[in-house]
Amino acid sequence: MNRIFGRGKPKGPPPNLTDCISGVDSRAESVDKKIARLDAELMKYKDQMKKMRDGPSKNMVKQKAMRVLKQKRMYEGQRDQLMQQSFNMEQANYTIQTLKDTKTTVEAMKIGAKEMKKAYKNVKIDQIEDLQDQLEDMMEDANEVQEALSRSYGTPEIDEDDLEAELDALGDELLLDDDNSYLDEASSAPAIPEGAPGDRTTNRDGVLVDEFGLPQIPAT
């Protein structure tokens, strides 16, 4: 049968919006180039008419410029249509891509919810509470062991009378520490001799004193 009727042409991949957008944009660029060439031609006719006087020759150039302008307006309309088509397809393509992303997100969330359910099935609150109770009991036992190990032996009993006596004794010691009279006595002691033996000096009262600051007895 294939020999008689021949084989059908293999079907190509279906068109997608991205390829369509590229094709439309390429056509719009081609139209822009044509418009640019027509603009250059209009400028040429403009320069010619500036140099010409009114008459049949100038009117002929003006008619050519009118035909070029009509072509330009036609191409501009085509370009605007192509640009609008491209914009519409881009919006549609964006919407489709957004929907695909949303679908992927929803599927991922569903998979995550299933995994969470499976994980929670293996978690039992009663077992966790029992484990917490066991840990609390073990901590209490450990504290009791520490208290037993830190117990002191042979410590004398202390009553309130012993405490008051100790505090009174501490107060007396503090008073003794605050008594600085011995410092005054030390400061009033004779100073170290400064002069050489035999030097004659006087104190503040004008009395002769020796090198130790002691009054000298006059020789008789």
UniProtKB/Swiss-Prot annotation:
Residues 1-10 have a biased composition (Basic residues). It is a peripheral membrane protein. Residues 1-27, 178-206 are annotated as: Disordered. One of its GO terms (cellular component) is cytosol. GO terms for biological process: late endosome to vacuole transport via multivesicular body sorting pathway; protein transport; vesicle budding from membrane. Residues 25-55, 121-153 form a coiled coil. InterPro entries: Snf7_fam. Keywords: Coiled coil, Cytoplasm, Endosome, Membrane, Protein transport, Transport. It is found in: Cytoplasm, Cytosol; Endosome membrane. Probable peripherally associated component of the endosomal sorting required for transport complex III (ESCRT-III). Probable peripherally associated component of the endosomal sorting required for transport complex III (ESCRT-III) which is involved in multivesicular bodies (MVBs) formation and sorting of endosomal cargo proteins into MVBs. MVBs contain intraluminal vesicles (ILVs) that are generated by invagination and scission from the limiting membrane of the endosome and mostly are delivered to lysosomes enabling degradation of membrane proteins, such as stimulated growth factor receptors, lysosomal enzymes and lipids. Belongs to the SNF7 family. This is Charged multivesicular body protein 5. It comes from Danio rerio (Zebrafish).
